[in-house]
């Protein structure tokens, strides 16, 4: 046909802000508030408010183009003529574009500093402690050639860290307490959801290493369980011993399935190669170390820097656990709005009781994704609903337990590093 186009290139575009004035609206919506309709009036108000004070820079980045024909095939080909194959190809195309947008999105100074402060779950840090908390993360991003803004690269200097803290204080996200012996900075519970807007712009760069940490811990525990079973005589009954490396990959697959509605993953084989490369960067002999027993697995985990799974994965897992708790408590509930309402109330209760480490998990946005996952797993229909909902809750509780272990390890390391960095008397 005359004028026919054989291919279309989709250009991934990422837009990142140092700060946005509307993060408070984002937080209110996450708490269960209503979302304002977006039209020309909203756009005018957005531009006017964004220009009302200095919120920093806007970063526009263009990724590697995606060829539509590489997924859909030639015009009139088998994929184009098969509705099911065409639908799947379009889904894969969308995921590839989204993944490339994420890969091209630069990490900002705002994102790095809020990530460090959110990891403290409301506890304050001195200026020196903020800089110490930034060090490992910045080294990691540098070693992986992750794109960063000039402001993020400048965080090796004290002046850039101070400027970022001051900007976040002015933006109402960070609180400064300066009337004591040492000034300190924190993100209080009332601002944690707003701060996640910035933190979430970088966590996809940390996702694979976060999954690796949890999988290493699971592999070590499987080896320990196998050893206990062998001591009890049950291993000889079955004649088989679980392979820790197999347990590692099983856990990667399970976590990928758990988080598939939150993150854009590459195709399974490609993602497996990415995970293997990530582990090799931490330790080229990681497989043999996993097979050396639980103690070696613990040493492997302890040597991974930085430890990030409690920062990257915990907010999602704890939000899912709240929804699972609601579903397990009442196996007759089926309305999404009822589940979200009950989960919001339960989350606020658990925060007050300190059964949740942070209020950022109490988010209607995360609860909606949790409901997607629950429906995907058939937890709103079928037989044995109560038992399957209880099993889902138990799975998430066990994952939270392992996140607690990694967080405790990260805190002990941070304290050790902080003591080592103190000047001698």
Predicted regions and their residues:
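Membrane-interfacial terminal anchoring regions of lipid-handling membrane enzymes
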Residues: 1-425
